[in-house]
Amino acid sequence: MRPDSLSTSNTSLADVLKFTLEELENKGEFYDVVAVAEEIYPFRNKEIVKNMIELMLSGKSDTIYAAWEEKRITWYGTKDELEVLGGNSWIIKKSKNEDNVLTSLSGYLLLVKPSQIRKKSLFSSVTEAYVIKDPIAVLAIHSQSELEGVVNHFRKTITF
């Protein structure tokens, strides 16, 4: 079990991973890669996981995280000063950034080399996004009520 000091609302994932890695290494267990996945993705695709692990084992990156490419117009800022970050729309013509926005889904799967965890720098050095294209795979369910909503939606829309 991790100590109470690492169970507060402002505890970072980097702190928890560093503690866990130190505990494992103190027991003589050493790993080339650490995988982190939250339980909120019930439709996580095993082929995506396999592909991400293979990409990590190719040795090009220190960190690989799952991501979603948002193709719709994405805004940033306050309501008085909004700026387009990326995306496409037939209504809004952009003059700046033509790129789409990547949303981190590190809870879907985050693969990190232990050297990055020791430095508590999960997203520095050589970081790579693995873009997931399956919208069902990235569906996150955070609560019982969200789960019930999804199940009820599927019951209404799926016929046998």
What are these regions (language model features)?
Residues 11-15, 39-136:
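Conserved core of the sugar-phosphate nucleotidyltransferase
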Residues 25-26, 57, 155:
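Residue-level signal for alpha-helix termini/capping positions
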Residues 26-30, 61, 159:
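Secondary-structure boundary/capping residues
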Residues 1-35, 43-51:
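Short phosphate-binding loop-to-helix
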Residues 21, 53, 151-154:
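A generic alpha-helix structural signal
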Residues 130-160:
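Hydrophobic helical membrane-anchoring modules
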Residues 17-20, 117, 150:
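Buried hydrophobic packing segments
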